[in-house]
Design a protein with these regions (language model features):
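A short core secondary-structure module
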Residues: 229-255
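N-terminal helical capping/dimerization or prosegment-like subdomains
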Residues: 2-105, 337, 341
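Acidic/histidine-rich catalytic neighborhood of metal-dependent amide-processing enzymes
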Residues: 123-124, 128-207
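Active-site metal-coordination/substrate-binding segment of hydrolases
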Residues: 89-160, 455, 459
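A generic structural motif
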Residues: 130, 222-224, 231, 344-352
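A common structural junction motif
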Residues: 99-100, 249-254, 360-370
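An extended, acidic, His-containing surface patch that forms the Zn2+-binding/catalytic region
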Residues: 49, 88, 198-199, 258-337, ...
Length: 471
């Protein structure tokens, strides 16, 4: 494909097709199921799904079979199946994106809104613009572009789901149903839901951490009691007991997880090599891009150690505490108990079952003065290492990066989680996993002022088109 002609074509398609539809998508307040208790009845997820279906039909992708799946009790899912146009090509390429959204949060600029799209300095602002709305329209536009350029393609399938920000349970359910349709020769999987360290090259994610979320429930009193004459100094304070649990997980001197089962035995050598190359390009930008108050310093001074911390070491954070009175509601009473929600990010290649047993041991080995202390595990997602891409895919993607960004492709790890990738890998262990995206450090996904770099989006459409036509 001639790169100049392709760039010009994609520029036009982005302006007349992608951008207006993506703006309409932002206007739909379709929060992920975890954040919208009424998702089954308010029709917002279905409205977003219908927008995707309408866009796919509008593009008139040749021979595309467009399916909107709506099984009872599950969120909608869009599955598109496009047969190969190459003769005797029985390979399948699977592309993925999600169209549910995080809550809006606070702190948006006065002239910006999560559901009223704004274009400013070649960035599109609004919830879902970067995570992950652009992916759906980019993927479909790339496929149509290939057809318009008369490129012969392998079979292409698309899965667009609407529960990624909550759980992968719905996606796994549908994926298992689709396995017989997908067949046994899926050679590449492209989840377009990852990030980039800059907008000057194609970034390829080769590792993601897992996540383990759990609740620590502490019960001491059958009712609230006056903390002065009744309970103070007699009954152990709830946060003190919660801290005992936390201290069993975290080394309080340095904040590191001390449960050995949570650590990977050895970081792959290829990761060390790629980190060195990445740091040569990015340097300390990772730190500079964090919204720190003056005087706040990172846990370590060495950038490489910080990136290893973020990608290949476990962390534990407190997400919330129930039954802890707000300051404005303060009284002289001790609550009957508390529930602390904790979340661990876990490196790839660790054993979930051993970690859960180790966490249970933290409870059984500690003394809590007879208080009822229990663990409730409510969510787990596997980490994944994707270090075995074929040379053919690497070469195509690297050439595409040079053509459309002007620089070589770079591999890097991610500190976040896309648990479904590990599940896909278990079903198709020999497939190339091409995990990429254009969510940069200024995209603010999950936070206020989420935005999409529109120039990077155009380049990503070009790269997808190029890869699909060359693979």
């Amino acid at each position: 494909m001639d790169s100049k002609t392709l760039k010009k074509y994609v520029e036009k398609q982005f302006t007349i097709n992608v951008l207006p539809n993506l703006m309409n998508f932002i206007r739909i307040p379709n929060l992920s199921p975890f954040y919208d208790n009424n998702w089954k009845t308010n029709g917002l997820l279905l409205k977003a799904a219908n927008l995707i279906v309408s866009y796919a039909k509008y593009l008139n992708i040749k021979n595309a079979e467009i399916n909107l799946l709506q099984d009872k009790g599950y969120t909608p899912l869009v599955f598109i199946d496009i047969p190969a146009s190459r003769q005797n090509d029985n390979r399948t390429v699977l592309l993925y994106g999600h169209f549910d959204k995080q809550p809006y949060g606070t702190g948006w600029d006065k002239d910006k809104s999560p559901i009223d799209p704004v274009i400013e300095n070649d960035h599109l602002y609004g919830r879902g613009a970067a995570d992950d709305g652009y992916a759906l329209f980019s993927i479909l536009t790339a496929i149509k572009t290939c057809q318009d350029f008369n490129r012969l393609l392998p079979r292409i399938c698309c899965i667009f789901e609407v529960a990624e920000e909550s759980t992968d349970t719905h996606l796994r359910y549908y994926f298992d149903k689709l396995l017989p349709i997908l067949g046994d020769n899926v050679v590449a999987f492209i989840p377009l839901d990852s990030g980039c360290a800059d907008y000057n090259r194609l970034w390829m994610t080769n590792s993601l951490r897992g996540v383990l979320d759990f609740d620590v429930v502490i019960e001491t009193l059958q009712r609230e009691s006056h903390y002065g004459p009744e309970a103070s100094g007699i009954i152990a304070e709830n946060l003190f007991l919660a801290r005992k649990v936390y201290d069993g997980i975290i080394d309080s001197s340095n904040g590191e997880v001390k449960i050995k089962e949570c650590n990977v035995d050895k970081i792959p050598e290829i990761v060390e090599e790629q980190l060195t190359k990445e740091i040569e390009i990015i340097g300390e930008d990772y730190i500079k891009n964090l919204p720190l108050y003056d005087g706040v310093s990172p846990l370590k001074s060495d950038v490489k150690e910080l990136l290893i911390n973020n990608r290949w070491k476990p962390t534990c954070n407190i997400l919330g505490i129930d039954n802890c009175p707000k300051i404005d509601d303060k009284g002289f009473a001790v609550s009957s108990g508390i529930k602390v929600r904790m979340s661990m990010r876990l490196p790839p290649l660790v054993d979930k079952d051993k970690i859960i047993e180790a966490l249970k041991k933290v409870i059984s080995d500690n003394t809590f003065f007879g208080a009822n202390v229990s663990l409730g595990f409510y969510d787990y997602g596997e980490g994944v290492f994707m270090g075995n891409m074929t040379n053919k895919s690497k070469n195509i993607l690297n050439k595409a990066s040079l053509e459309f960004f002007g620089n070589e492709m770079i591999f890097n790890g991610g500190g976040g989680s896309i648990p479904f990738i590990s599940y896909f890998q278990s079903k198709y262990p020999n497939a190339d996993i091409i995990c990429t995206g254009i969510v940069g450090s200024d995209a603010h996904e999950h936070g206020p002022n989420e935005n999409l770099n529109m120039e990077a989006c155009k380049k990503m459409i070009c790269i997808l088109s190029y890869f699909l036509s060359e693979i």
